[in-house]
A protein has these predicted regions:
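Bacterial Sec-dependent N-terminal signal peptides
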Residues: 1-28
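Tryptophan-anchored aromatic micro-motifs
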Residues: 26-59, 69-81, 109-124, 128, ...
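Charged, amphipathic alpha-helical segments
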Residues: 52-59, 93-104, 125-153
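Short, exposed beta-strand/loop patches in secreted or surface proteins that constitute
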Residues: 60-66, 91
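Mid-length scaffold segments of soluble, non-membrane domains
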Residues: 79-87, 92
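Short beta-strand elements
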Residues: 179-191
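Eukaryotic low-complexity, non-globular regulatory regions
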Residues: 212, 217-251
Length: 251
């Protein structure tokens, strides 16, 4: 049974790879004509900021279609669980890929990827705010005539359906690597994390002090009491992006 599952996982992974890499093509007019706001709205992602791999969380709160390729984005960033900054900007669609074969199973639904670039400016206190820029990919699936976010519930695939790779530039001009995703953070050093048998990544001790301690305590630290674990999980599961502040805020 395990061998069958492994073979199934490998086949699905290859299909995803084939979909994302081999079939990239020019934007399709029928897809671009639709409102793709739903692909970006309410996304929660996690990533790294800087060479020390400080934890950054990103949540997109509002999306509005400007034209066939451009969408206005509003969202909130949180660095090391403490500095929260609202941001606004845009994503631009550059190309669309379609899978050679539609992938649908109990755990996965994917018809292709949308690729593009983004620019988000944090606003508020110049001591903390900056600008995010880079490239993104977003998985999609067709639901009748509607386009919806792709779906993947198999952690073992280590597959990102939402992925942003780029940099963050401070108001003073300091530039840092900054990438985030829904599953596996891109652009991390080889020693950033280890994967367990379930396909979950666990940040290595070297980087934990940079905002990752609570995540480790919530799901992977076996030396804590039930109450301590519960407290850590509440922090991870809270809707931290619901704030009224129009500027950067320190927790």
């Amino acid at each position: 049974q395990n061998m069958k599952q492994k073979i199934y996982h490998i086949i699905i992974f290859l299909l995803f790879w084939f979909c994302g890499v081999a079939y990239s093509q020019n934007p399709k007019a029928d897809i671009l004509q639709q409102d793709l706001s739903g692909l970006f709205d309410n996304l929660s992602m996690i990533g790294i900021l800087g060479e020390d791999c400080s934890r950054i969380d990103i949540h997109i709160t509002e999306v509005r279609k400007m034209d066939s390729r451009e969408y206005e984005i509003k969202g909130i960033s949180r660095t090391r669980l403490s500095v929260i900054c609202p941001f606004k900007g845009k994503v631009c669609v550059d190309s669309i890929s379609s899978c050679s074969q539609m992938i649908k199973s109990e755990y996965t639904e994917l018809d292709g990827f949308i690729y593009g670039h983004y620019s988000f400016a944090e606003y508020g206190d110049k001591q903390y705010s900056g600008t995010f820029s880079g490239s993104f990919k977003q998985g999609y699936r067709m639901s009748g005539q509607q386009i919806e976010k792709g779906r993947n519930e198999m952690a073992e695939l280590k597959l990102n359906l939402s992925e942003y790779r780029g940099k963050w530039k401070s108001a003073k001009g300091l530039t840092k690597v900054c990438s985030w995703a829904d599953e596996i953070i891109p652009d991390t050093p080889a020693n950033f994390c280890l994967f367990n048998d379930a396909g979950e990544w666990i940040v290595s001790p070297k980087y934990r002090k940079n905002g990752w301690e609570n995540l480790y305590n919530a799901y992977h630290n076996e030396n804590l009491t039930t109450d301590e674990i519960q407290k850590a999980r509440e922090v991870e599961e809270q809707e931290w992006w619901i704030i009224k502040s129009q500027s950067c805020k320190i927790n």
